[in-house]
């Protein structure tokens, strides 16, 4: 369960971060972030970095959609603007296979919030409010580590590049991310993965 720390920066204007298309973290940066992030958020960011889940998907994730037996995360609902919404397209409604690091993170998280409805939640059991998490946890951590300030959505782009770099099948990666084809993978991420070649014959 997430425990909020006192915000010593109350009254300070939030950091302005320009919107960028794709600016993934390196594996070394991911490891640094996970090493130094607040312990109560380590599982949260581990899942983000190694599944590519969208913010609305991970914030709306309920335990009933975590299948430990099959090692899958079922994307069926999202949390958007304080409301639960069902996934509307075949691409967004999907099953994500858990890598071992994700499986272990969710096992650890279950010990903390397993009696709650939501996987990652406040003390009251309500879904995380992503703006609060970003301002209180994400941006301060990046500043502390001296890393380039990037929006949390870059964790999704990072997951894509890490999976491609590790040699995973592009069609499998596309399904994990909710893409209908592999075209976007190569068009968007190829410049971040040295020696990447297409394996789907296209």
Predicted regions span which residues?
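Short, polar N-cap/turn motifs at the start of nucleic acid-interacting alpha helices
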Residues: 65-72, 149, 168-188
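C-terminal catalytic core of tyrosine-transesterase DNA break-rejoin enzymes
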Residues: 39-42, 46, 50-57, 132, ...
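Active-site/catalytic core of tyrosine-dependent DNA strand-transfer enzymes
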Residues: 28, 70, 77-78, 99-148
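Exposed loop/turn and edge beta-strand positions of beta-sandwich/beta-sheet ligand-binding modules
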Residues: 19, 41, 69, 92, ...
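Catalytic-site neighborhood detector that most strongly recognizes the C-terminal catalytic loop/helix
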Residues: 16, 24, 79, 177-201
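Extended, charge-enriched helical/coil interaction regions that scaffold DNA-processing
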Residues: 2-6, 52-54
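Conserved tyrosine-mediated DNA breakage-rejoining catalytic core shared by Y-recombinases
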Residues: 10-23, 27-32, 51, 60-111
């Amino acid at each position: 369960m997430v425990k909020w720390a006192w915000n010593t920066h109350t009254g300070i204007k939030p950091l302005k971060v320009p919107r960028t298309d794709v600016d993934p973290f390196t594996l070394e940066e991911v490891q640094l972030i996970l090493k130094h992030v607040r312990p109560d958020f380590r599982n949260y960011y581990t899942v983000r970095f190694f599944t590519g889940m969208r913010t609305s998907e991970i914030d709306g994730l309920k335990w009933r959609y975590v299948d430990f037996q099959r090692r899958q995360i079922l994307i069926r609902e999202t949390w958007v603007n304080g409301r639960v919404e069902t996934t509307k397209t075949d691409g967004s409604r999907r099953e994500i296979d858990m890598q071992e690091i994700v499986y272990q993170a969710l096992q650890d998280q279950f010990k903390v919030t397993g009696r709650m409805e939501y996987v990652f939640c406040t003390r009251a059991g309500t879904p995380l409010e992503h703006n609060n998490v970003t301002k209180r946890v994400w941006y301060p951590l990046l500043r502390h580590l001296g890393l380039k300030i990037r929006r949390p959505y870059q964790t999704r782009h990072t997951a894509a590049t890490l999976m491609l770099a590790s040699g995973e099948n592009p069609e499998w990666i596309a399904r994990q991310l909710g893409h209908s084809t592999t075209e976007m993978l190569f068009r968007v991420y190829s410049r971040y993965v040295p020696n990447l070649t297409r394996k789907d014959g296209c």
